[in-house]
Amino acid sequence: MVPYEYYVALSGLLMVLGFIGVIVRKNIIAMLISTELMLNAVNVAFVAFDMKLHDVVGQVFVFFILTIAAAEAAIGLGLIMAIYRMKKDVDVEKLTELKG
């Protein structure tokens, strides 16, 4: 069995990669994918600590986070589609107007 420290390290690596993706990318869709990667990093950490503590609370939190992530992705993609229809672009640096 793989020690839980490896899962925690993997979770940290995924979190850092997701954070770098949010900071570096200029495309809104890539930023949304990076945010989802960070949420999945939290899920891996919860499951790793759940393995160590022999409790099911971590797995319950994972189900809640997956539900929230699905709702966030649906709302985010809907907003991105609306922005694309208005501006014909999804580049963050070109979306500086607050006018409706």
From Swiss-Prot:
The keyword Transmembrane helix applies. It comes from the Bacteria. Disulfide bonds: none annotated. It is found in: Cell inner membrane. Gene3D superfamilies: 1.10.287.3510. HAMAP family: NDH1_NuoK (MF_01456). NDH-1 shuttles electrons from NADH, via FMN and iron-sulfur (Fe-S) centers, to quinones in the respiratory chain. The immediate electron acceptor for the enzyme in this species is believed to be ubiquinone. Couples the redox reaction to proton translocation (for every two electrons transferred, four hydrogen ions are translocated across the cytoplasmic membrane), and thus conserves the redox energy in a proton gradient. This is NADH-quinone oxidoreductase subunit K. It comes from Sulfurihydrogenibium azorense (strain DSM 15241 / OCM 825 / Az-Fu1). The gene is nuoK.
